[in-house]
């Protein structure tokens, strides 16, 4: 007999050490919480598939290592490990795979997800139930039988045959118990006279109630009122008990007065339909063994044993306290136990089968029984939910919840089986994941679920057979499940027929027809997949999708076929089932002389098979007596031997009276050890179990003549009867051959169906459009600024390159002409001639015009202090030979004013150079030069004809002669004359400073430099520095009034002041003087310009009042897009920039800036809502017209210009249930985080195709076609957090991060040499200009120090600008980088150590593997001859702060570095922690240690530290598993100890 496990079993040293720690007060809770947090952290982080494969592989290895040692702690660890893997899968499913494009896809995908959530819930509940089976052992009864209680044995019956019931009754009468203390009652709801007669004959009590109300429960309740025993023992009428039943079970009931129920297993000595009908079923454990062998024993640990309706003892007082057996549901047994436990009663389970019964003979009966169970458990779930109400512990609630919700499996099972059909038939991909991702996440989840269940179930249930059981019943239970949940009162009790015979085998179509239909549909889906894979033209993505779903469909089909195969009923002619038994017997004559001795092989109520050697040839049936001794009692049974030979004899009983029948029952069923081998099956081997399931499918295709006629189960038993591969070496070969045949058959059927599936439509994978929008860069120009290189539409807004506030070209007004004539009278006499090619003006290349894009143009500006006196346009290019001079032309206009017309010459397609004079009066500050292509005749053209085109060469020239206008020195004109916003080119602003370069004066200059940076924005600004006023041109002079150059005449100032004075050496130039009586006033004066809240005065002099500046907050720069709410496009650009005209309107751009240190949980995309309007009517081709959306030259998505709702939408619109599509469309779009950095640009390209091609159309149709983005379109960055891994010079190159985190640079200090030269100061000012352009805010908070005073700003980020002559002073600031500057060279001084490399390789094995052949690059380069270096590292003064050093031996090198920051094309090459610039060449390096800046909410730290780090995920996850297992094992042991403490004490006394 198994003993109760003690909590003080031998443990390993590690376990003992952990036990000592856990014994400390509060340690267990602390360790448990820490372990749970670690486990949650590890499950919350998703990894790329290739990294997840590492986690999966290691977890599989650990599974085999731990699973090799069978122990309770190992099982708990495997369950927790399985939970870790499954929760990682669940996290991945919820966060990475739920991307649906259609409502049908969303519906199907959601259904699959809900089914998976149900499966995971059941998995975890099963782990909870079985985490610590109690293994309860029998307790001895009091030694004096007089102290034993009285027992009433109930045998309820309704319509069963007497031949079945009499076995149970006679077996009950033979139970070893004092006769005066036990009474057997036949509860006959059929009220049959033969049963009453039998009761009188055998000595049982017969009870028949007048009505059949409440079926079995009512029958039992009626009997309770007519009996008075202390306990009630219930047997179903086919369950024959062993004689030791009460002696082995009553000890617990007597010992513990709180136990209301003692349940024992339901063992069936006949095979169930799965064992009998499937070819591999005979070696498979019965379906019910899992529940009685594992689940109930686990329930007992939680004091949640269920009453199963039979083979159980109940305490009468407990039953009477709840008002009798429950009658509200059709499963009175489970509901009765629940009611008793709600009142505080305990239940117990003894895992020793003490009765044997009949399994359902036919599949349809089996299904009917399960339908009743499902209905009853779901009724309890609805009307008496265990999660609610009083009296239950959480352990009991969860165990009951598991039992009830397990019968909800039908709908999820159907969903799992049919899910691949969503893609194979409808092209709906309901899991948005690659096959590699599924392999990395789903397969490990299934492996651990199956493997851990195999370790738990051992030989009680084989892997994959639950799928067959569920599939067999699922389609029958779907309706029952739904109806019962909606209406729990429906349904009635049905009695399961037992003991039937089958004269011949047949196929029970009624039991499997739903699965046949499902199987045919699945086969069609599989055939479709095979056909597409074989003959379809698929891209790689579609091919993988078909392969994955076809494999899924194949697995589903195998399970369905196995379920169908159960319907192949085999014949059953025997009235009595054979029961294997090994009992010594003697065969004697009538006179008592022994003929032969032997050992029985099997027994039944019809006879016995005995191993023996019959001494003589058997001439016919011979009467004999079989004698044996059972438990000290001799049994002599009359029989006849009917066959003998081969060491075996077959006997049949010759029963003449009730006593002889009683003796046979005692021999066959009543032995105390009759069923001890009930669970003696081989341990589960999942792969072999899968092969058995496949082999069972083969039986479905056998002919009627091949049906195996088995009269009884040949169950694998201990000893010689056990089926063993070592005894049957050909078994594996047979399994393999059967598998090969099955696969071949399926392949043949699939191939045969491919011809029929050939005409089926193929799902075509969506592709990105071949044409993707491209963002136009705006290169700086030497004199005039081009505003666009795309299509410039007359009278419309800029198509993509105009910045905010830039004016559009307008026809020249009369008052403008008068003003120009008036100004011309005072102009200088010096004229300047400018020659610009179209490329110089901003054309990306030659300008080509076609019918769909007939209007192309260029925007440029004229400085406001210049007057155009003459101009000429010199053109060259080519025109299509198909053009005709009488109908086709190219017309040039400037600001809507006619310049000239080009006519084609078919004989000479090329033309030019051709010169066109331009009236200088046409020019304004902002100008638009347009080229308009006419491709038709008489107002009609074929705009879609690609053979009609005209091209203007990019080398065509615009020659402009200008003279300077007299200066107008008004502060209100600032930033003119230094920068004219109409002239969009790189700006140069000379700065005049005293040679001492006082830090306060430098700060004032830096404020002004950043203000100019804001004005020039992305154009860039350079500040050449000198100590003297230039001989010509404009300049800014900053200094204390008393220190200003005497050439200015010492202007009188009474405080902070700003003045515009003429350049003493150039009357047409202006000097902007920023001054004050002291250095503080100079700073105030510079702030007066930079922070002016109102327009500056229309005067040349301004006294500045002190300026109050509010402290800045992180990431609040005016240039940065708001991140706490969705931002409208209309707040980023003017509405005109969002509009386009014509079928091809060019690229509409929406630029914005954002801090680059953005981080989202799991790299969740940002949200963008695109709203756009397209004209109604039939002008465009709906199927081909689209809007392409991109960001930073990365394609995101395309949308049709006219929203369509498909067939369903058309039908709904037709009946008036849906509104027709409107011109406004609204689409939500995901923006991947990796596409966003500091300077960003959204690109929108409308590509509208005309409805009719090749047909003459109105020439005005194209220009009348208007498309545009709605200004209420939004982009939302509110889900982003700020954190970044440094060093990363790319952040600096885009928006000056991390220094611009505070827009005024209040957390930044600039480190300059003690005596900087002009080049160093110029580099400083250029850098401040760059910062101002990045933030649109003056750098009023920056501090300037020398290297000797950096300790005063230790808590700030440091910007170091130095030449090699002073490099020694700043060397300590770079101590945390891997570089040093010495002897004019920049060198690498340190690499990671071997230990660091090893740690890095373990932390990120994939990267280490990819970089295994690469070596760190050593840097050794001279910083002379214009070579500059930019180094970024963590500050040695304060952790988390950054040092950025700009180093060179000369000003040219520093200037080169600063110019590099302003060139967008070069920004992409600025990366890592070191950039070396040499002319146009850039080299980036990454060697220095990394560090992190920024903060995250606590819940985001796991994702930040473990994303892309599989080893970290493993370490944290396994640590959590170990800690949780340690705490769980101790807690479970203590719980078991509490459960048994009093009884163990009692046993020790005995």
Swiss-Prot record:
Regions of compositional bias (Low complexity) in chain numbering: 768-796
Activation/inhibition comment: Activated by c-di-GMP.
Catalytic activities: [(1->4)-beta-D-glucosyl](n) + UDP-alpha-D-glucose = [(1->4)-beta-D-glucosyl](n+1) + UDP + H(+)
Membrane-crossing residue ranges in chain numbering: 26-46, 47-67, 106-126, 398-418, 423-443, 468-488, 507-527, 547-567, 1513-1533
Residue span of region Catalytic: 1-741
Domain notes: There are two conserved domains in the globular part of the catalytic subunit: the N-terminal domain (domain A) contains the conserved DXD motif and is possibly involved in catalysis and substrate binding. The C-terminal domain (domain B) contains the QXXRW motif and is present only in processive glycosyl transferases. It could be involved in the processivity function of the enzyme, possibly required for holding the growing glycan chain in the active site.
Protein role: Bifunctional protein comprised of a catalytic subunit and a regulatory subunit. The catalytic subunit of cellulose synthase polymerizes uridine 5'-diphosphate glucose to cellulose in a processive way. The thick cellulosic mats generated by this enzyme probably provide a specialized protective environment to the bacterium. The regulatory subunit binds bis-(3'-5') cyclic diguanylic acid (c-di-GMP).
EC number: 2.4.1.12
Protein family according to the UniProt entry: In the N-terminal section; belongs to the glycosyltransferase 2 family.
Coiled coil location: none
Inducing or repressing factors: Cellulose is produced at a linear rate with respect to cell growth when O(2) is present.
Organism whose genome encodes this protein: Komagataeibacter xylinus (Gluconacetobacter xylinus)
UniProt subcellular location: Cell inner membrane
Stretches for region Catalytic subdomain B: 317-377
Active site: 189, 333
Biological-process GO terms, alphabetical: cellulose biosynthetic process; UDP-alpha-D-glucose metabolic process
Names of the cofactor(s): Mg(2+)
Family annotation (Pfam families): BcsB (PF03170), Glycos_transf_2 (PF00535), PilZ (PF07238)
UniProt keyword list: c-di-GMP, Cell inner membrane, Cell membrane, Cellulose biosynthesis, Glycosyltransferase, Membrane, Transferase, Transmembrane, Transmembrane helix
Record GO terms (molecular function): cellulose synthase (UDP-forming) activity; cyclic-di-GMP binding
Region described as Catalytic subdomain A: 147-240
Gene that specifies this protein: acsAB
Primary residence: membrane
Protein name from the UniProt record: Cellulose synthase 1
Pathway assigned to this chain's UniProt record: Glycan metabolism; bacterial cellulose biosynthesis
Superkingdom field: Bacteria
